[in-house]
Amino acid sequence: MSKIENIRPILLTADYGDEKHPEILECFPNGPKRTIGLVEVTLENGVKGYGEGYLGVFAPNVFKSIIELCSPYLVGKDGFDILRRYKDLCSVCDYWSLQGAARHTTSAIEIALVDAKSKTQKCPAYKLFGNSSKDQIETYGSGGICDTKEHFIEELELLKSLGIKKYKIRSVPNDINRTAWVLKEARKYGIDIGIDMCQNLADPPISADDVISYINSVKKISKEKILFLEEAVGPMDINGFKRLKETLKIAICGGEVITTPLEMIQRLNLDIYNFVQPDASVIGGMHAVKEVFEHAKTKKIIPVVHAWGGPVAIMANYH
């Protein structure tokens, strides 16, 4: 046992991308910079643990405020009883944020407690959950927000230099020729393409019919395989996901926006994904991701962690 002595939020801002990059112009109205939201938990033994919540990328001051709200309910309590502290956080937040923003801050604190406990025990975080059956995890390059062929080639060259064999691009239904060209060009590099349609950001999102028409049009131009379609319809369009999975011979995936294990498990039971994408910095922390992994195995659905935050969120998902 080691009591929690202090909890503090840390907001960081860093340069990100180039001011003329299409992603910056479309998604970052404040210019080429990104924020992340971290939590530092200090135990009475002096060990500090760090966690991250994805909310800090989008609403850093909201992240900070919720952490400050929750901290007094945890200080002085056992920092090693992580599941009990998780329940404490749920007691504070679930009435007004059963889903959504507070789940991200709960994630951050849970990750920080895992970090502090593993540091105290002088072991990698994953050993607190048992062990690992793998000694490495394959990654893919996430990009493809490009408006010129030269930009795509620049990203493909970078992936080749890093030995990365999979490349996720962003596309929507009017990107037929662009998608077909990238599929052909990537084959020259021995790189496979997955497509993120980003419909968790769209209102209204596109329909399953739109997606099917888009894919069929691409296939008329290019015979290259598409590895997966991510968030191809809106996050609440359960029937749309099912239709895509039943109609297209492409792996259908999603789930990065889901903020509770219960909702993710319900989706697994509905068999709407070929693989599912929980994020420890969103869904309630590392124990929540493990819960999703365990249920996914019973359904023979592959879990693939999502991480688009900072290094703490990436490492939490890695473990």
What are these regions (language model features)?
Residues T42-T120:
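Metal- or metallocofactor-binding catalytic centers and their adjacent structured scaffolds
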Residues Q121-I145, D271:
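N-terminal small/glycine-rich loop or linker at the start of catalytic domains
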Residues I176-M315:
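Catalytic core of soluble alpha/beta enzymes
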